[in-house]
């Protein structure tokens, strides 16, 4: 279902498409440089970057990636980012929100191979 309100406006302005894990995205950068893949497969891009949007009520499904992943909250929020380490240890919650006295920050880096959902 298309996003409504400000989220819908951003989907249109940024030319976002539905993301397979939920939300909306568009790749905005793919490095010409490559690096070895951590699991020995062929080389991969040294850096990629996407615009990603979760409208109110949307979720990003549990997933993990082979590289560190940086989240940046640019508008809206707060965003609840759930994390589980590769050994399936303790569940952690990081709240992305504008900087405040409670320690909220608008960005977080999820380490490679950690499970994450938002």
Predicted region positions:
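Non-catalytic, conserved peripheral segments adjacent to functional cores
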Residues: 1-109, 116-118
